[in-house]
Swiss-Prot record:
It holds the Pfam family PTE. This is Phosphotriesterase-related protein. CDD domains: PTE (cd00530). Belongs to the metallo-dependent hydrolases superfamily. Phosphotriesterase family. The keyword Cell inner membrane does not apply. Its cofactor is a divalent metal cation.
Length: 350
């Protein structure tokens, strides 16, 4: 029987409830720090406060405090928001911190125990530039062995074995680095063997998701067990997105709550708004793709947590879904995207 592998053990898919499929509760994002504009250097070097928050929202990657999503203050704020998520009907969170992002499995396990929210942890590799020496030269075979071990055997956390429940996020730049090609191929190989879900992080160019899927499918991975993340900042043309959808993977809009059009990590494009995300999802629903859609926030900086003036993990449930209902999306369609699709993606028979 297919089950979902959480950090506290296996559960049946029907117990997941509403699920956020791409989040982080602790990670190190300092690699993406950008020097602040000279005019705002003082404000962005200061501690985040009401007087500096406006600058941080415009230049989130220019505040070192903001990208240090791993210190005690960040963990306390993340726990508060997971509890708010639970309060507002949240059931499960898929934690996408992989090798290179310094995932904190001990904290994830503690959150699962203390909040009652199901957490599914990922294995896999982030971009090559963020790997330490022990991982930077791994072969496809070595990666495959590692991913399989993390899922089948688990990792030791405080004397107990904690198993990962999917492969992800598997991240790449563009052109895709050889190390990252190995990670994509290893994910495809292990997916074919174990049947588990996979989550991909494409670079910020339209060609990247297509190339990732080619490598993954050629390695044996199933399209219907693969999520392509961050498509709301990658493929902006709806016809091109429909063309990509023909490959059969899940289409994930996972930057809900990111409302600043100026996108520091790709200044050549404007980040779309939540209203535009809703409009695009409705277009995809009308094209018959509701069974391939997923939603999340990809919280990875402090300023998106409520303790720092942000929206928290409950934003989709409390703010986005009501707006979708107002625009004609049905409860059945919302349940498909937030409950059924995540369960179908995560369930496998290890």
């Amino acid at each position: 029987m297919s089950t979902v592998q959480t950090v506290l053990g296996t559960i049946t898919p029907n117990l997941l409830g509403r699920t956020l499929t791409h989040e982080h509760v602790a990670l190190d994002f300092e690699h993406f720090y950008r020097p602040p504009p000279p005019d705002f250097e003082c404000e962005l070097k200061a501690k985040i406060s009401m007087s500096t928050l406006g600058y941080v929202r415009l230049y989130p990657y220019s505040s070192k405090e903001n990208v240090r999503f791993y210190d005690g203050e960040a963990l306390e704020a993340a726990k508060k928001d997971v509890l708010l998520y639970k309060k507002h009907g949240g059931g499960s969170i898929v934690e996408n911190s992989s090798y290179g992002l310094k995932r904190n499995l001990e904290f994830i396990v503690e959150l699962a125990k203390s909040t009652g929210v199901h957490f599914i942890a990922g294995t896999g590799h982030y971009i090559h530039a963020m790997q330490d020496a022990s991982h930077a030269s791994l072969s496809v075979e070595q990666m495959s062995d590692l991913y399989s071990k993390d899922i089948i055997t688990g990792l030791q956390v405080n004397g107990k074995m904690v198993k990962c429940g999917f492969i992800g996020e598997v991240a790449s730049v563009y052109p895709i680095h050889d190390f990252e090609k190995n990670a994509i191929k290893a994910a495809g190989e292990i997916q074919e063997v174990l049947g588990c879900g996979v989550s991909m992080h494409p670079h910020r160019v339209t060609k990247a998701p297509f190339e990732i899927m080619r490598l993954y499918l050629e390695a044996g991975g199933r399209a219907d067990k693969c999520v392509m993340s961050h498509l709301d900042r990658t493929i902006f043309d709806i016809d091109e997105l429909l063309e990509f959808a023909k490959l059969g993977c899940y289409i994930q809009y996972d930057l809900f709550g990111t409302e600043c059009s100026f996108y520091q990590l790709n200044t050549s494009v404007d980040m779309i708004s939540d209203g535009q995300r809703i409009d695009n999802l409705i277009k995809l629903i009308k094209e018959g793709l509701v069974d391939k859609l997923l939603m999340s926030h990809d919280i990875h900086t402090k300023h998106r947590l409520t303790s720092y003036g942000g929206h928290g993990y409950h934003h989709i449930h409390t703010n986005i879904l009501p707006r979708m209902f107002d625009r004609g999306v049905t409860l059945e369609q919302v349940e498909q995207m937030t409950v059924t699709n995540p369960a179908n993606w995560l369930a496998f028979d290890p």
